[in-house]
Amino acid sequence: MRRIRIRLHAVALGAGACALATFIGGCRQSTPATEPISSGRVVDLGHALSETDPTWDGKPAFSRQTVATIARDGYFGETFSTEEHFNTHVDAPAHFAANGATVDRLAPDRLVHAAVCINIAAEAARDEDYRLTRADIERFEAAHGRISAGTIVLVATGWDARWPDPARYMNEKNGKKHFPGLTAEAAALLAKDRRVAAIGIDTASIDFGPSEQFEAHHASMPEGAYHIENATGLTALPPTGFTVIVAPIKIKDGSGGPTRVFALLPERQ
C-alpha cells in the first residue's frame, strides 16, 4: 500500500472535540439487525497515535515535535507528521476506486449510523489467515436479521490484542503478512448487495495478510463503501443494537486519514 504523508499543526488546538451525540442517519429504514440508539455509554474503538505503532512497511509513519511549552510560552503545542493510512484510520473509496469519494466527501450520515458486529475471533484464533465468508454473513443474518443499507459493519477478530507488539501484529513470515480479513465475495456482498456504508476491522486491512492484490478493497470501494482499519475493542461489542460514530481528519481530496471511532451502546450492555 502506498505511503501518503500529511503534516498538521497541533498548536493550541485543545483536547475538546465536538460530541456527535444524537444524530443517527437512516433511522427510519432500520431493521432489527441495525436498530440505532441515540443515548447510552460511549466506547472508544481507536488506538492513540504514537511513534511506536505498527506500520505497513515497518518504517516510521508518525513523528511530532514540541513547538511551545507552558513554562516558556504559556501554552502547550506540537507539530506532527503522519501517513494517511496509519493507526486507526479510514480508507476513503478513492483509495482504490478511480472515481470514488475522497475522505472530505464522505457524507455525514454514512459516518454516524447504526452498526453491527460480526465476531470471528474464534475462527481467527484457530487460523491466523481466516477470512470472513459469505456464509458467515448469512449465518449472522439468520440469527440477527438482514443487514440494511447504510449500516456500518464491524468485523471482530481479536487481532488488536497484538497491537503493543508491532512484529506480532503485522506477523510477517517469509515475506508475507498473516492476519485475518474478508474474502472478496464477503466484501462484495456487504458493499454491493447490502449497500453498507462501511466495513471496519481490528487488523491492518480488511484484506487478509497474505493478499497481494487487495481483492476485498477492489470488491467494495467501487461500490462506495469506506473502510475502518486498525480498530480496537470490537470483540466486546454486541452483535446489534448500537451506533458507531466515525470522525476522520477531513483532508481535502485525501485518500483517507487517522480517525476517532466510537460505539454508542445501551446502558444495559
Question: Each predicted region: which residue ranges?
Answer:
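Active-/binding-site microenvironments in catalytic and ligand-binding cores
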Residues: 27-269
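A detector of low-complexity, intrinsically disordered, Ser/Thr/Gly/Pro/Ala-rich segments
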Residues: 2-4, 20, 29-32
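Bacterial N-terminal signal peptides
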Residues: 11-23
